[in-house]
Each structure stands twice: as C-alpha cells, then as structure tokens.
C-alpha cells in the first residue's frame, strides 16, 4: 500500500446494495489535500476535495428512501454543482438548473 500524500487523486465510490431490491453507487474523483490540525492535535491531517462535479440523475432518486440528512447533503451537493458549473456551461445553464434543483 502507498500512503496518501497531498496532490494524489483517487475515486470516492460509496455504495449500498439491498439484496433483491436495489443498489446505488455514486462516484466522484477527489484530491488529497492538507487539512487543518484540530486544536490540541499532535499531527498534521489530510482531507479530500471533490474534483468532479456532476448532477446526480433525479430519475434514479426515490426521495422517500432518504433521511433528512441525506436529502440535505444531496441538495447542498447540487447547489455546489450548479454554482461552480453555471459559469462554464453556456447554453446548458437551464438544463443544469433543472438537474440541480432542490429535492427536499
């Protein structure tokens, strides 16, 4: 194994599979970066910053299966996607706004 170092890029692929029912996997690329040491901490920490931003397809989301915290995370993620990509997408801005509208 190789220890993580700032600047390394890896894939974050959380997933959940309910046997015989459904499964989901969401994947983004993240970059390793220094993270502030907590007060009283005795060593430097690393964290991750998401590099790839893309709306999660709403047609695949069953909001009733998500907790309030999960819905809040999804809406915050979509708000970030819209804010960061809006200046870059030109004619696709309307599509982006629709894809990133709040679920909760």
What are these regions (language model features)?
Residues 1-104:
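Charged, cofactor-coupling segments
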